[in-house]
């Protein structure tokens, strides 16, 4: 788990010992989380990834990954086909984050969702004092080149979860790649991750 990105490392830690559970990693990238879940916990991990080169990389590692678009292809999965769905740092790139959340909670019993927090104090400072869209560790790409089309804050996500009837089971906040406490997370956290259950579907 040491080589996993911080949010993926938390998921691997939390799911350790859940042998036989089924996990769908949406936007799975190079499959690092899936490989860790399979190798360390005996979890049946599947993935969806839009980038064909990353799909090939996953398949070469013996991972079960299909090329697909989270905005449309989650609809092909039956209700509660997985114990957990995972969407890490992909939500802001989706066309309709609200619909993606519906689908994650329809397809899985629970969902892990992580994202860069647009209300972090460095982001606020860049807008307030520089008058420009920020380029930070959490948002490293200039506005004209980023894949993010829907920036989100901790408070925005909590409001969306409530609107969707989802229950926030647990939450984690990160700054500098390390976990931080909950107080003041909307301005202190560079990244946030939530474990959700329920939903309207």
Locations of regions flagged by a protein language model:
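Class I SAM-dependent methyltransferase "Motif I" SAM/SAH-binding loop
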Residues: 27-29
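Short conserved loop adjoining the S-adenosyl-L-methionine
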Residues: 73-79
């Amino acid at each position: 788990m040491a080589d996993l990105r911080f949010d993926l490392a938390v998921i691997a830690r939390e799911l350790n010992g859940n042998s036989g559970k089924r996990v769908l990693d949406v936007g799975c990238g190079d499959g690092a989380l899936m490989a860790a879940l399979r190798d360390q916990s005996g979890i049946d991990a599947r993935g969806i990834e839009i980038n064909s080169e990353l799909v090939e990389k996953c398949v070469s590692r013996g991972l079960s990954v299909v090329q697909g678009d989270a905005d449309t292809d989650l609809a092909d999965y039956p209700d509660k086909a997985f114990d957990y769905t995972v969407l890490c740092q992909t939500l802001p790139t989706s066309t309709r984050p609200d619909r993606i959340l519906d689908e994650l909670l329809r397809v899985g019993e629970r969902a892990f969702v992580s994202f860069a927090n647009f209300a972090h104090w460095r982001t606020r400072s860049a807008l307030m004092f520089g008058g420009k869209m920020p380029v930070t560790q959490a948002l490293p790409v200039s506005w004209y080149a980023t894949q993010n089309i829907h920036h989100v804050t901790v408070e925005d996500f909590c409001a969306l979860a409530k609107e969707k009837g989802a229950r926030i089971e647990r939450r984690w906040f990160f700054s500098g790649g390390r976990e931080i406490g909950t107080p003041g997370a909307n301005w202190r956290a560079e990244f946030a991750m939530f474990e959700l259950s329920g939903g309207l579907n």
